[in-house]
């Protein structure tokens, strides 16, 4: 067989694999710097996407308060505009607000202008609600292309993904979701042998419309928060997670 006929498809396959890795794999740095871990194994960054959600977010805030847990909320701009009081409450209770675009599109298929518009509109919504824009950004579905991280950087935002995505958006019972957060406990038990900690990505809202039942997420967190605390984990915002703790 002509070696060219072999080489061309092979090169195309390798190229496709590289793009897939860059776009989908949370730890990939190919398209630019992405935060995907905390700087200390004793830290756990709790992050919540797709809110604010009047049906769930207030209950979540109360739960976090019980454990003196600070978290990062990656909010959708159009929901921020509908829920300005709730957005202000998130910030007032010590949590960090971050950018999750205006409408939650798949940015992988968009060009730089559309990507920039999505990010800027969410920044404007946050500016209007709480008086300042976000410093951190998470792309919807975690998908990136060459313009996503560079555009976020132009808007003075760092891009954040995760170490654990347990799939709480799926229509599964809490008994299915809870064990999928077990890796955090296992990592905490091995903290002495690790030099970084976990970023958990779960959801307090649903991106298609305002609201959504995320009670399974609350149920799983009710189980895990006291156990993670007892393992010595400190619940931190992303801003705290990227700075080395004082000794």
Positions of PLM-derived features:
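Hydrophobic alpha-helical topogenic segments used for membrane insertion/localization
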Residues: 1-24
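Active-site beta->alpha N-cap acidic-glycine motif
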Residues: 23-114, 118, 125, 132-134, ...
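A cross-domain feature marking catalytic cores of carbohydrate-active enzymes
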Residues: 48-50, 73-77, 99-101, 139-141, ...
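Alpha-helical scaffolding segments of alpha/beta enzyme cores, especially the outer helices
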Residues: 59-62, 85-92, 117, 121-124, ...
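A short acidic, helix-capping loop that chelates divalent metal ions and anchors anionic groups
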Residues: 105-110, 168-172, 207-211
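Alpha-helix N-cap and loop-to-helix initiation/capping positions
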Residues: 110-117, 176-179, 212-220
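His/Asp/Glu-enriched short active-site or ligand-binding loop at hydrolase and phosphoryl-transfer sites
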Residues: 143, 149-193, 233-244
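Catalytic grooves of carbohydrate-active enzymes
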Residues: 185-239
């Amino acid at each position: 067989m002509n070696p060219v006929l072999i080489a061309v498809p092979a090169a195309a396959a390798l190229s496709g694999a590289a793009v897939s890795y860059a776009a989908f794999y949370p730890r990939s740095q190919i398209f630019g710097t992405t935060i995907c871990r905390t700087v200390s194994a004793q830290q756990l960054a709790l992050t919540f996407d797709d809110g604010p959600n009047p049906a769930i977010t207030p209950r979540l805030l109360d739960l976090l308060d019980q454990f003196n847990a600070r978290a990062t909320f990656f909010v959708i701009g159009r929901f921020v505009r509908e829920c300005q009081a709730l957005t202000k409450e998130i910030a007032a209770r010590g949590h960090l607000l971050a950018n999750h675009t205006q409408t939650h599109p798949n940015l992988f298929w968009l060009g730089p202008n559309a990507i920039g518009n999505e990010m800027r509109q969410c920044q404007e919504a946050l500016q209007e609600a709480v008086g300042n824009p976000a410093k951190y950004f998470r792309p919807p579905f975690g998908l990136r292309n060459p313009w996503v991280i560079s555009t976020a950087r132009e808007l003075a935002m760092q891009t954040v993904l995760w170490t654990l995505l347990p799939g709480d958006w799926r229509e599964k019972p809490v008994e299915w979701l809870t064990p999928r957060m077990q890796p955090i406990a296992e990592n905490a038990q091995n903290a002495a042998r690790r030099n970084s900690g976990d970023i958990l990505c779960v959801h307090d809202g649903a991106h298609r419309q305002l609201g959504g039942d995320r009670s399974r997420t609350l149920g799983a967190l009710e189980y895990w928060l006291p156990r993670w605390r007892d393992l010595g984990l400190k619940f931190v915002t992303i801003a705290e997670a990227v700075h080395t703790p004082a000794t």
